[in-house]
Amino acid sequence: MSTRYHQAASDSYLELLKEATKRDLNLSDEDGMTPTLLAAYHGNLEALEIICSRGGDPDRCDIWGNTPLHFAASNGHAHCVSFLVNFGANIFALDNDLQTPLDAAASREQNECVALLDKAATAQNIMNPKKVTRLKEQAQKNARRQIKECERLQEKHQNKMAHTYSKEESGTLSSSKGTFSRSSPSNASAPGTFGSLSKGIKDTFKIKFKKNKDTAEQVGKEGRSGQRNVMEVFREEEEDSFSGDFKEKLQLSAEEDGSVHHESILNRPGLGSIVFRRNRISSPEDISDSKREFGFKLPSELLQRQGASEADEGAADEEGEENGLKDDLPWDDDEVEWEEDVVDATPLEVFLLSQHLEEFLPIFKREQIDLEALLLCSDEDLQSIQMQLGPRKKVLNAINRRKQVLQQPGQLVDTSL
């Protein structure tokens, strides 16, 4: 299974690898990968050195027979290949395709790794040919064992998948059988139910058939006797009852119409004794009626002046209300501008504006540099994007000041409002 040491070997987390034991460093996951294989695969030389120094096996392979040398050579990690060769890893090891690390590097066109492995193989053949022969025999023996183990794992996996598939199929069939079996107890009482149901259906059919038969006989009689008279359609009793009911309904409707009283529109629940202001000027007829009602006469000029003053007061009140509403608003309608389409400034734009360096924004946008990338840039990086000396110094000075402020933010104090 995969452990934290596998992840540490992949990410080159050295502090955690220094705490690992020999068992932890040689533990395989579901693909047969050990921390040694992962470090060689990713080209993490420092992690590979720590793992091998703490007991990691440099000749351990995965389920496909790939050793750390195979991974390092095929991925072009020449520094890892050199370390493994010097550490004593078997350069003649074979994978399940019977390929050596030299063959794997050649298939990937890793020329530097091919040169290192060829030089090491030549040196070992010259120095100790017997050891080379023994290493090749051991590699072939290990390759045969690895191939058998891989075939066994594949067969086991296929059997497991077939068993899972058959189990799912049997589960589906058993569930359908269970559905049928659960419906069988209800079928046990079916004879009585079906008997009563069939009896009811038969009775219904008999009634329907009898009714249809009577209707057919009646129609036949009418057809033989000819067309019926109009007086035969309604009976006398029905006519009397119909006329009596109709007369009663007419009397009730007349009484209801007489009792209906249309109330005023102002007589509504909840309004109480609210006084509604009259917004119109009195007409001459109303004025003349009021003269006759109160029994005194007013000069027509006075009434005209009074009506004009009331109209002026009403217009002034309306204008005052409108002006009051406008004065209560905390903003000016003419100056309000909707900013729905305004895009927020990026952190890079804010940083450059705060340092008065906004003229360099197009250069950084052209190179797709954001604020995080800018903080990682050095003088050589800025020079590589063809920035002049003066702008480079300004940008680097602003970056240094930002880093100093972030490192020493200062103490937070309360301020008086």
UniProtKB/Swiss-Prot annotation:
Residues 130-164 form a coiled coil. One of its GO terms (biological process) is brush border assembly. It comes from Homo sapiens (Human). Residues 1-252 are annotated as: Mediates localization to microvilli. It comes from the Eukaryota. PANTHER family: ANK_REP_REGION DOMAIN-CONTAINING PROTEIN-RELATED, ANKYRIN REPEAT AND SAM DOMAIN-CONTAINING PROTEIN 4B. SUPFAM superfamilies: Ankyrin repeat, SAM/Pointed domain. The modification Phosphoserine is found at residue 283. Residues 351-403 form the SAM domain. Changing residue 48 to P: Decreased localization to microvilli. Keywords: ANK repeat, Cell projection, Coiled coil, Differentiation, Phosphoprotein, Repeat. The lineage of its organism: Eukaryota, Metazoa, Chordata, Craniata, Vertebrata. Residues 171-190 have a biased composition (Polar residues). This is Ankyrin repeat and SAM domain-containing protein 4B. ANK repeats lie at residues 31-60, 64-93, 97-126. Part of the IMAC/intermicrovillar adhesion complex/intermicrovillar tip-link complex composed of ANKS4B, MYO7B, USH1C, CDHR2 and CDHR5. Interacts with USH1C; the interaction is direct and is required for ANKS4B localization to the tip of microvilli. Interacts with MYO7B; the interaction is direct. May interact with HSPA5.
